[in-house]
Amino acid sequence: KKNGYAVDSSGKAPECLLSNYCYNECTKVHYADKGYCCLLSCYCVGLSDDKKVLEISDARKKYCDFVTIN
């Protein structure tokens, strides 16, 4: 499993202000374990390896991984 910004068919990650929205978006739409709002987009934790995710910088990924774990 992997973490990242899950993208829809148009290649965009859902934008967010609230983590509740992302939890639902990530778990119900993308079947991840959890979801959080990180840097204004929904960051999903526990996505299946075949899910498409947004290409992001290592620094941004490390930041979101750090924030979602703590």
Curated annotation (Swiss-Prot):
The keyword Disulfide bond applies. Belongs to the long (4 C-C) scorpion toxin superfamily. Sodium channel inhibitor family. Beta subfamily. GO terms for biological process: defense response. SMART domains: Knot1. GO terms for molecular function: sodium channel inhibitor activity; toxin activity. Expressed by the venom gland. CDD domains: neurotoxins_LC_scorpion. The keyword Nucleotide-binding does not apply. It is found in: Secreted. InterPro entries: LCN-type_CS_alpha_beta_dom, Scorpion_toxin-like, Scorpion_toxin-like_sf, Scorpion_toxinL/defensin. One of its GO terms (cellular component) is extracellular region. This is Beta-insect excitatory toxin LqqIT1. Gene3D superfamilies: Knottin, scorpion toxin-like. Has the structural arrangement of an alpha-helix connected to antiparallel beta-sheets by disulfide bonds (CS-alpha/beta).
